[in-house]
């Protein structure tokens, strides 16, 4: 029930209770505020409120506390990533956890506290006024995390390749004009030689794959540049980082295939 003041008259609004025993959680980085609402056969609701640490010990205590009151339905906001450890622990205990976007559980204006927020979430959940967010099964979540990380690695590799290409450009080493892939076998071999022997004149023929369609004369002209010491250091670090990231990418892709 909610009390509203309109034209100096008190109006009582009643909401149907769909869940007789449920819990609302206000999850933060360090603490988790919990409120269980238990409604008896007469429609009277009593609340049990407490606070738990967000450490693993606190999550186990939360699970035990819910079991004590035979509460198997929980609702919490999807705030940042803090909800994920809570969800993982409760999911293993066969607790039905509803995740909701904060805009659907926005608390009332006024004297706002974490305990009141937990009770507000509990009340909304109790009256079935919370729009749940979709949470895929555990195996799909695991796969999704790896796929997202794979995408991040690809973006990082692309960024490093762009920085490496910039080093070649400012050094007037126009490998991108004569090779379709600046980081391919032939181009990479030439780049490695330039880094080991800066300023040396050399014949590119031994480094170029025989299947390369670009004339040797053009490739020879493309490497007629000069790389400064600072650009050489930067290029070396970029290439090393690319190799390291590609190794990580391969490991992640193998794990994705395993799943």
Model-inferred region functions:
Residues 1-259:
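A detector of single, family-specific signature residues
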């Amino acid at each position: 029930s909610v009390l509203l003041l309109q034209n100096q008259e008190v109006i009582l609004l009643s909401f149907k209770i769909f869940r007789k025993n449920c819990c609302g959680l206000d999850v933060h980085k360090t603490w988790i505020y919990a409120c269980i609402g238990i409604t008896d056969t007469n429609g009277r609701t009593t609340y049990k409120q407490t606070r738990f640490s967000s450490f693993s010990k606190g999550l186990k205590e939360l699970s035990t506390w819910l079991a004590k009151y035979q509460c198997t339905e929980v609702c919490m906001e999807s705030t940042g990533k803090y909800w994920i450890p809570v969800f993982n622990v409760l999911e293993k205990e066969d607790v039905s956890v509803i995740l909701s976007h904060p805009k659907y559980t926005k608390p009332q204006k006024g004297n706002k506290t974490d305990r009141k927020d937990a009770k507000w979430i509990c009340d909304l959940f109790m009256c079935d006024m919370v729009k749940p967010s979709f949470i895929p099964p555990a195996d799909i979540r695991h796969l999704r995390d790896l796929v997202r990380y794979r995408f991040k690695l690809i973006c990082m590799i692309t960024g490093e390749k762009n920085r490496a290409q910039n080093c070649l450009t400012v050094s007037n080493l126009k490998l991108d004009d004569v090779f379709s892939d600046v980081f391919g076998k032939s181009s990479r071999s030439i780049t490695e030689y330039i880094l080991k022997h800066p300023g040396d004149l050399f014949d590119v023929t031994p480094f170029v794959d025989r299947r390369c369609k670009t004339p040797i004369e053009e490739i020879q002209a493309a490497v007629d540049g000069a790389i400064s010491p600072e650009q050489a250091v930067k290029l070396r670090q970029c290439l090393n980082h690319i190799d390291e990231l590609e190794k990580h990418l391969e490991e992640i892709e193998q794990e994705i295939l395993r799943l």
